[in-house]
Curated annotation (Swiss-Prot):
Belongs to the radical SAM superfamily. RlmN family. Specifically methylates position 2 of adenine 2503 in 23S rRNA and position 2 of adenine 37 in tRNAs. m2A2503 modification seems to play a crucial role in the proofreading step occurring at the peptidyl transferase center and thus would serve to optimize ribosomal fidelity. The gene is rlmN. This is Dual-specificity RNA methyltransferase RlmN. GO terms for biological process: rRNA base methylation; tRNA methylation. It comes from Campylobacter lari (strain RM2100 / D67 / ATCC BAA-1060). S-adenosyl-L-methionine binds at G172, E173, S204, S227, L228, H229, N303. It catalyses: adenosine(2503) in 23S rRNA + 2 reduced [2Fe-2S]-[ferredoxin] + 2 S-adenosyl-L-methionine = 2-methyladenosine(2503) in 23S rRNA + 5'-deoxyadenosine + L-methionine + 2 oxidized [2Fe-2S]-[ferredoxin] + S-adenosyl-L-homocysteine; adenosine(37) in tRNA + 2 reduced [2Fe-2S]-[ferredoxin] + 2 S-adenosyl-L-methionine = 2-methyladenosine(37) in tRNA + 5'-deoxyadenosine + L-methionine + 2 oxidized [2Fe-2S]-[ferredoxin] + S-adenosyl-L-homocysteine. Its main location: cytoplasm. The lineage of its organism: Bacteria, Pseudomonadati, Campylobacterota, Epsilonproteobacteria, Campylobacterales. GO terms for cellular component: cytoplasm. Its cofactor is [4Fe-4S] cluster.
């Protein structure tokens, strides 16, 4: 393991306490996050002896891309190897294509969402998730989380000023690593770093009610997504063992008390699984659960993987489910499945790579 410190692990305030004079921290941040510098010696605005000091004591990112796969829909999945040899995944999702006029002038820039991992593996044990098979290995540091985004932006030549959305929906349970995830949020939001507003960062959780409360008390301004996937405790405990510790009632109570921008909604992710939770009776129960909550439901059609216990539902059933919710006044969308041809669901690329 390297004894060098990961520069991406530090907030600007922390860096100000390590380097003198303090304004050097701002300069370093601008080189790293705005100019995508990957060598301290390139930082020409810094004194040469200071650059040498940085080179001897810090590194930029422990990430090494060992495999990537590009889907026909433009999604790109990356498998990263960390300094200790552990592997994690991240995905670049193009949300809107670039628009140009007849003269080739850009009218609207392309928009992207980057899905990042927060842990190596996961201990939640969800029966439909491939990552859960291997259990939890360790938490990612803030720098390892930030590094995924920085690497993807740099290697896809996405300019610093181009807006991206961040979703903490990759490998791991983000709220099980709240300290480092919240630190990553702050680093990314810094105007001298990537300036990604917390309102463009969504933290997804399987429903850790205690940590939802802690996240709310931090008042970071992030968006919250709840991986619900079932409308009663019996079924949810079967699909998601974490429900035995935090049942649906406790999750809903935590959500009702969670501070969120009045212009935004709490997202509820609902994975539709054929014959398991995709019936109208489930939709009816979901409407009751969400009563009084400013919510948006994101329906996701199950993405099968090798050895999966479940099947993908029909599009027809998904539309019926959506129509029922919409008719009852619940904002609801069916998430466009991206990367089906590259196994872009969480843990699939890592699993395939390990078998090769």
């Amino acid at each position: 393991m390297s004894e060098l410190k990961n520069m991406l692990d530090f907030t600007k305030e922390e860096l100000e306490n390590l380097v003198q004079p303090k304004f050097r921290a701002k300069q370093i941040f601008e080189w790293v996050y705005k100019k995508y510098a990957d060598d301290f010696l390139q930082m020409s605005s810094l004194p040469k002896d200071f650059r040498v000091y940085l080179q001897k004591n810090f590194h930029f990112s422990p990430l090494k891309c060992v495999k990537d796969e590009k889907s026909k829909d433009g999604s790109i999945k990356y498998l990263f190897e960390l300094l200790d040899g552990k592997k994690i995944e991240a995905v670049l999702l193009p949300m809107k294509e670039e628009l140009v006029d007849e003269n080739g002038k850009i009218i609207k820039h392309a928009r992207y969402t980057i899905c990042v991992s927060s842990q190596v593996g996961c201990k939640s044990g969800c029966s439909f998730c491939l990552t859960a098979k291997g259990g939890l290995s360790r938490n990612l540091s803030a720098g390892e989380i930030v590094g995924q985004i920085l690497w993807i932006k740099k290697h896809n030549k996405i300019p610093y000023e181009r807006r991206v959305n961040i979703v903490y929906m990759g490998m791991g349970e983000p709220l099980d690593n709240l300290k480092n995830v919240s630190k990553a949020v702050k680093i990314l939001a810094d105007n001298d770093a990537l300036a990604i507003s917390p309102r463009r960062q969504t933290i997804s959780t399987s429903g850790l009610a205690k940590q939802i409360k802690e996240l709310g008390e931090m008042n970071l301004g992030v968006l919250l997504a709840i991986s619900l996937h079932a409308v009663n405790d019996e079924l949810r405990s079967e699909l998601m063992p974490i429900n035995k510790a935090y049942n649906i009632a406790s999750i809903m109570e935590a959500v009702r008390n969670f501070p969120i921008d009045q212009r935004k909604r709490v997202m509820f992710e609902y994975l539709l699984i054929d014959g398991i939770n995709d019936k109208i009776e489930h939709a009816k129960e979901l409407v009751k659960l969400l009563n009084g909550i400013k919510a948006k439901v994101n329906l996701i059609l199950f993405n099968p993987h090798e050895g999966s216990l479940y099947n993908r539902p029909s599009v027809e059933n998904a539309i019926k489910f959506q129509d029922y919710l919409s008719a009852k006044g619940v904002t609801c969308t069916i998430r466009e499945s991206k990367g089906l041809d590259i196994s872009a669901a969480c843990g699939q690329l890592k699993e395939r790579q390990s078998k090769q």
